[in-house]
Structure formats: structure tokens, C-alpha cells
């Protein structure tokens, strides 16, 4: 199966691969960030958003992977084999988890559209030959934040903007007042 964990969010594995591996913070830093910003929503039995669900699943997968890695590390007697397992997990699996955590934390913090715009901007920047691109890459934190903090409980009322009334280009007409309306 060819499963792309970003597809339902409008991104792709390829789009995230434009960001260099050293761009993503450590798993520990990302877990601390997720906990500090979204602990209540992540631990809640209520469904908050698809990003919360994906973030929750990535955190659980990382925990299971660490349990497996610890078990393998404790049961492999050959130090070279143990080192290979640790390096593989940190290099390959760790990068995928760091990308997932970063993507969903960023979507919750900045908004999905802003993150997608950033990924496309960075992808264009990195593929442009150095002589023709600005010296600095786009920075996500300089884009406007769109995060909305919601309280648990009732979902907020959605308000649609009222349509703007078009003003006539002709001068305003005054209503003539009838004698009966001058009470």
C-alpha cells in the first residue's frame, strides 16, 4: 500500500522532504511542545480536529517504537547490532516521526493553509538555483498566526458575514413625510 500520512491535510511526503532533516527539532522538543500547547486537547476523550488525532497517533507510535527499541537493545548481545538498530531507528523512523509531529503541531499553531503555503514557498526557494534566489529561506514563524484557542464544551457558533449593501451611485432620495407620520 502506498499510504501518505499527509494526503488528507493537503500535503505530501514529498512536499515535507524539501525541508532538510536538520530543520526538524528533536522528538523530545516536539513532544514537549505538543504537551505544553495541546495537552488538554490530546488527553481529552472528545474529538478536537484531524490534526489533534494525527498528533495523538504519532505520539503513541513513537512510544511503541521506543518500547520496541528498548526491548531489542536489551536483548541484542552484539554491541554492533545494537548500535545498528539504534542508528536505524533514530535516522529513519525518528525523521518520519519528527516530520509528522512538526507538521501537525505547526498546523495547530499556524493553521493548515499557512503551513502548506510555507512548504510550497520553501520548496520553490530550495529548488531555485542559489544565484537566483533570496539569501534567506522563508520562515514559518514570520507568517501571521491563525491559531484559535477553543474551550471544550459547546462548539462555537459559526457566523457568516452579512452581505454588504451596495450603495447607489445616485443621490439619496428623501422620503416625503406624510402628515399622519408626524405624531
Curated annotation (Swiss-Prot):
Region listing for 3 X 8 AA repeats of S-P-R-R-R-[PR]-S-Q, in residue ranges: 155-177
Spans traversing the lipid bilayer: none
Cited Pfam families: Hepatitis_core (PF00906)
Modified residues (Phosphoserine): 155, 162, 170
Subcellular location(s) of the protein: Virion; Host cytoplasm
Keywords (A to Z) from UniProt: Capsid protein, Cytoplasmic inwards viral transport, DNA-binding, Host cytoplasm, Host-virus interaction, Microtubular inwards viral transport, Phosphoprotein, Repeat, RNA-binding, T=4 icosahedral capsid protein, Viral penetration into host nucleus, Virion, Virus entry into host cell
Assembly description: Homodimerizes, then multimerizes. Interacts with cytosol exposed regions of viral L glycoprotein present in the reticulum-to-Golgi compartment. Interacts with human FLNB. Phosphorylated form interacts with host importin alpha; this interaction depends on the exposure of the NLS, which itself depends upon genome maturation and/or phosphorylation of the capsid protein. Interacts with host NUP153.
Family assignment from sequence similarity: Belongs to the orthohepadnavirus core antigen family.
Designated name of the protein: Capsid protein
Organism: Gorilla hepatitis B virus (isolate Cameroon/gor97)
Amino acid at each position: 500500500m502506498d499510504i501518505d500520512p499527509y494526503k488528507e491535510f493537503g500535503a505530501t511526503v514529498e512536499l515535507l522532504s524539501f525541508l532538510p532533516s536538520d530543520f526538524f527539532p528533536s522528538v523530545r522538543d516536539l513532544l514537549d511542545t505538543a504537551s505544553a500547547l495541546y495537552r488538554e486537547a490530546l488527553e481529552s476523550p472528545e474529538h478536537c480536529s484531524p490534526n489533534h488525532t494525527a498528533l495523538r497517533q504519532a505520539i503513541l507510535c513513537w512510544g511503541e517504537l521506543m518500547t520496541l527499541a528498548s526491548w531489542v537493545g536489551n536483548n541484542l548481545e552484539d554491541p554492533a547490532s545494537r548500535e545498528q538498530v539504534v542508528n536505524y531507528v533514530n535516522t529513519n523512523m525518528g525523521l518520519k516521526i519528527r516530520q509528522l509531529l512538526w507538521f501537525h503541531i505547526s498546523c495547530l499553531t499556524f493553521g493548515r493553509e499557512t503551513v502548506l503555503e510555507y512548504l510550497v514557498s520553501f520548496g520553490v526557494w530550495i529548488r531555485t538555483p542559489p544565484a537566483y534566489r533570496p539569501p534567506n529561506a522563508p520562515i514559518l514563524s514570520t507568517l501571521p498566526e491563525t491559531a484559535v484557542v477553543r474551550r471544550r464544551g459547546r462548539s462555537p457558533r459559526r457566523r457568516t458575514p452579512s452581505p454588504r449593501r451596495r450603495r447607489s451611485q445616485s443621490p439619496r432620495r428623501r422620503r416625503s413625510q406624510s402628515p399622519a407620520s408626524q405624531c
